[in-house]
Amino acid sequence: MAEQSSRNLDTGRAGIILAGGRSRRFDGIDKATAPVGGRPMIHRVAASLDPAVDELVINCRADQRDTFAAALSDFDVRFAEDSHPDHGPVFGLRTAVRASNAEYAAILPCDMPLVPTGFISHLFGRVQGGTGVIPSVSETPVPLPSVVHCRAGEVACTETIRAGSDRLKDVMSTLGVNVLDGREVQAHAGLDAFSNVNTIDDLRALSSRR
């Protein structure tokens, strides 16, 4: 039987940005603050989420907070600092949903700056009272971007951690999320929307397309 969360029943929508990684493939720079179109990448992600949500929650390490606060000064954000830094995105997601007051949360990584707000809104519309919804990209379900029920997501993260996994796709499997097919996804977002910026070369390629 799944463990019960101690959270109270919440309402509303949150936008969660997972940004606690070390950017080890980014030449020593925190990729969240790398410029995309003249703005820090994390600012671009926040700008995608903000119109579709009631609150923004930023998961990060304590040493990133001041830099991110400056980069996100245009937004009203809540920080959810990692209590277990460097333990991966499942710990980060659990920290973020615990910090949120929302019933559902849209989740984006800090390195996916092209997801349109309309697609985030579509995910919220498609969750339909369930535990979560994720897209299928090139016929493969992907865990981000996604919308999940915060309380159920917290429990699923805990169960995934206890099972020894640090993979978000295992969280989504535990949740039993719905998967949007590729045609529906493409109707609301181009394939470029799901591009991750993992390296400096990825950033250059992204900049050349803009």
Swiss-Prot record:
It catalyses: Mo-molybdopterin + GTP + H(+) = Mo-molybdopterin guanine dinucleotide + diphosphate. The keyword Magnesium applies. Disulfide bonds: none annotated. It is found in: Cytoplasm. Its cofactor is Mg(2+). GTP binds at residues 18-20, 31, 59, 86, 111. Mg(2+) binds at residue 111. Keywords: Cytoplasm, GTP-binding, Magnesium, Metal-binding, Molybdenum cofactor biosynthesis, Nucleotide-binding, Transferase. Its EC number is 2.7.7.77. One of its GO terms (cellular component) is cytoplasm. GO terms for biological process: Mo-molybdopterin cofactor biosynthetic process. InterPro entries: MobA-like_NTP_Trfase, Molybde_CF_guanTrfase, Nucleotide-diphossugar_trans. GO terms for molecular function: GTP binding; metal ion binding; molybdenum cofactor guanylyltransferase activity. Pfam families: NTP_transf_3. The N-terminal domain determines nucleotide recognition and specific binding, while the C-terminal domain determines the specific binding to the target protein. Transfers a GMP moiety from GTP to Mo-molybdopterin (Mo-MPT) cofactor (Moco or molybdenum cofactor) to form Mo-molybdopterin guanine dinucleotide (Mo-MGD) cofactor. Belongs to the MobA family. This is Probable molybdenum cofactor guanylyltransferase. It comes from Haloferax mediterranei (strain ATCC 33500 / DSM 1411 / JCM 8866 / NBRC 14739 / NCIMB 2177 / R-4).
